[in-house]
Swiss-Prot record:
Organism, as annotated: Rhizobium leguminosarum bv. trifolii (strain WSM2304)
Protein name: NADPH-dependent 7-cyano-7-deazaguanine reductase
Listed SUPFAM superfamilies: Tetrahydrobiopterin biosynthesis enzymes-like
NCBIfam families noted in UniProt: QueF-II
Residues where substrate binds: V74, E75, S76, H93, E94
Length: 154
């Protein structure tokens, strides 16, 4: 029988406030009922927002997170609120992208994780950030992230 114990979760099914910073945001996990099976979980945040640490202007990204769970899954509402906590947070693109991935890795200890952060241009230059924990296990179906390279008017 699947493990559906959610008693340790503090946000799911509750009214919650958005944390004012990523450091304050709570990420929660739930047990995986298929820990012995290698499969990919994908989260896509096509409207991720943070602030430029120098100008305070908004920065926007399309973020794709793929991971192969071990014993745990990230609870999706907590992930949504964690990502939303960057809205008023000033940090460079690279820092936001890697921080997100490392927080998830710290929480879950997944078998594998990758992040693709496709940032929209500021100052005329798009910045894309890619990171993964290592090679994915053999035989896992790993779709492309499907985000087109920024072309502007080209």
């Amino acid at each position: 029988m699947p493990n559906t114990d959610v008693s340790s979760l503090s946000m799911l099914g509750q009214q919650t406030e958005t944390a004012q910073s990523p450091e304050q945001a709570v990420l929660e996990k739930v047990p995986s009922n298929h820990a012995g099976t290698d499969y990919v979980v994908r989260f896509t945040a096509p409207e991720f927002t943070s602030l430029c640490p120098m100008t305070g202007q908004p920065d926007f990204a399309h973020i794709v997170i793929d991971y192969i769970p071990g014993e745990w899954l990230v609870e999706s509402k907590s992930l949504k609120l964690f990502l939303h906590s960057f809205r008023n947070h000033g940090a460079f693109h690279e820092d936001c992208s890697i921080y997100i991935a490392k927080r998830i890795v710290e929480l879950l200890d997944p078998k594998w994780l990758r992040i693709g952060a496709y940032w929209y241009p500021r100052g005329g230059i798009p910045i894309d950030v890619f990171w993964q924990t290592g090679k994915p296990p053999e035989g896992v179906w790993l779709p492309e992230q499907g985000v087109a390279t920024y072309r502007g008017r080209g």
